[in-house]
């Protein structure tokens, strides 16, 4: 696959997306139902919903810029498991957020706050699934990403099923990663682009220690990791944590660090073998993802445009519309269990 002549077309694709009123939404992104741009304004049900959401995100972001990577991970964890139906927001003993892969998820507080505000203004109208998509868009835009169009009209799912969480380990190979993304209707460009979200945020040392001390049971670090990075991470991540000790956190992109800025430095780090997670470094082991990585490392605007398209595609996976699902009154519980 050749991408050399593809990237100049991304701007046209994003512009055409912004100019359309609807987008197909489901597995493979080709279903019989549709999402609508500015759904709540178009249907005259909550004209200022997106304005309310943006205002709350701005308030939170000014106090804590880490909400950008937190919301990105939260949205990914929602959309990639049974689609973008807000089910990751549900609480309960068997909810998706209790799955091991979702340990350390954040961003719930801001979603709950936004929902409270919208319920006071437009009760029973704006779905939690749409709130999560719109809030994520606004937060990452504040961090430096493009403000891509978010098509709305999603409804909320009501299934609590931790066993359904099939999010892969961050230590998988590029072939395994690509197979997972393809199973969700996404492609190698989407995968390489969405992994660029690791340009900000943190990860637990437990996801990195195998690369630092005993890669593939060799008793040695991952030979693809820059030796300086190995030393830096070993200082922060012990080979094992004792009972009762917390699992330390390290930055996914030390170049961004606490600023949580959306940049293309992630791709430069991959090329120089300074990726923290194996799944990121593995991008060089596939011809297509390597070519895309090289392009994004040298062309930030190409990355920004591709990110806008990939987020729109991910946000359209297996959505509920029409009479399917419900509009939750409280994002943490289904209406049947709300007690209101």
Swiss-Prot record:
One of its GO terms (cellular component) is extracellular region. Its EC number is 1.11.1.7. It is found in: Secreted. It catalyses: 2 a phenolic donor + H2O2 = 2 a phenolic radical donor + 2 H2O. Coiled coil: none annotated. Binds 1 heme b (iron(II)-protoporphyrin IX) group per subunit. Ca(2+) 1 binds at residues 78, 81, 83, 85, 87. Its cofactor is heme b; Ca(2+). The active site is at residue 73. Gene3D superfamilies: 1.10.520.10, Peroxidase, domain 2. PROSITE patterns: PEROXIDASE_1, PEROXIDASE_4. Residues 1-25 form the signal peptide. The keyword Coiled coil does not apply. One of its GO terms (molecular function) is heme binding. GO terms for biological process: hydrogen peroxide catabolic process; response to oxidative stress. Substrate binds at residue 168. Disulfide bonds join 46-122, 79-84, 128-331, 205-237. There are 73 peroxidase genes in A.thaliana. Removal of H(2)O(2), oxidation of toxic reductants, biosynthesis and degradation of lignin, suberization, auxin catabolism, response to environmental stresses such as wounding, pathogen attack and oxidative stress. The enzyme activity has to be proved. Belongs to the peroxidase family. Classical plant (class III) peroxidase subfamily. PANTHER family: PEROXIDASE, PTHR31517. This is Probable peroxidase 61. It comes from Arabidopsis thaliana.
